[in-house]
């Protein structure tokens, strides 16, 4: 592929997810190149890229769209607008992992429409997202998700802090939340992007219902999803191994981003 046809990729956030994505880009994905990264700790990011074949410059979030055709958001949910808005205004494709934050910043979709560009949400840990999207073309009557996480993967979530709910020293599973996907996204911004992606693929954040459990007996992030539709009844479960660097996210998440990037430049695309 000629240099002219190569799409430049910038990564916003260089932690447990962003670093893995950058490593794959540096090793080589056909049709793509790592153009820039953004990180809170510039020196740490530069040191992490010391072994890269082609180290990328570390820039501010607002400047990523100047250097790239695709901006991958791998940052805390509170930074979504700061990352996505300038990139979309410049007509760039934006890959959003903090899709929980996207639920309450849906005007970004309108901005993408006006600018003729796209926001892409990776499948992440959500098995059968394609099936949910297909079912939504027909009629879906119910979508329910039960999430179980090790207590340390939920510690510090705003909903727990605001409601005085402790997950320390648990000896048995404790249900800490029940409500809609929209409420879950606000209360657990670092924990339940899976719920937001499920809601956006299906019947929306206000009709999708969520339970969240802190369970000391599990060592994985477990998501059980039940979908009732006129075309099918779907029941599936994902047991995602938590990231060593950040237990709030799973190891599958960065790999899903890499798979999406490969799909963008591949002559063959599998899935809806």
Can you name each region flagged by the protein language model?
Residues 4-9:
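Extreme N-terminal starter segment of soluble prokaryotic enzymes
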Residues 73, 96-97, 119-123:
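General beta-strand structural signal in soluble alpha/beta enzymes
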Residues 18-19:
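N-terminal Rossmann-fold NAD(P) dinucleotide-binding loop
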Residues 12, 125-272:
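Active-site-lining helix/loop region of Rossmann-like oxidoreductase modules
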Residues 28-49:
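NAD(P)-binding Rossmann-fold cofactor-contacting core
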């Amino acid at each position: 592929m000629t240099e002219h046809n190569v799409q430049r990729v910038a990564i916003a956030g260089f932690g447990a997810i962003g670093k893995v994505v950058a490593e794959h880009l540096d090793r080589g994905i056909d049709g793509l190149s790592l153009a820039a990264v953004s990180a809170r700790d510039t020196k740490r990011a530069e040191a992490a890229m010391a072994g890269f074949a082609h180290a990328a410059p570390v820039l501010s979030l607002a400047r990523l769209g100047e250097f790239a055709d695709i901006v991958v958001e791998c940052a805390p949910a509170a930074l979504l607008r700061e990352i996505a808005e300038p990139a979309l205004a410049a007509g760039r494709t934006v890959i959003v992992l903090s899709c929980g934050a996207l639920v309450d910043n849906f005007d970004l979709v309108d901005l993408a429409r006006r600018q003729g560009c796209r926001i892409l949400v990776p499948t992440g840990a959500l098995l059968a997202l394609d099936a949910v999207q297909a079912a939504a073309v027909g009629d879906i009557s119910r979508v329910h998700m039960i999430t179980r996480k090790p207590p340390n993967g939920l510690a510090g979530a705003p909903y727990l802090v605001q409601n005085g709910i402790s997950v320390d020293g648990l000896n048995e599973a404790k249900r800490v939340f029940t409500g809609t996907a929209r409420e879950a996204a606000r209360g657990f911004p670092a924990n339940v992007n899976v719920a937001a992606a499920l809601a956006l693929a299906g019947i929306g954040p206000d009709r999708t219902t969520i339970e969240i459990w802190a369970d000391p007996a599990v060592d994985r992030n477990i998501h059980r999803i039940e979908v009732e539709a006129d075309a099918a009844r779907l029941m599936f479960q994902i047991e995602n191994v938590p990231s060593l660097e950040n237990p709030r996210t799973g190891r599958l998440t960065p790999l899903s981003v890499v798979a999406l990037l490969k799909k963008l430049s591949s002559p063959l695309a599998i899935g809806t």
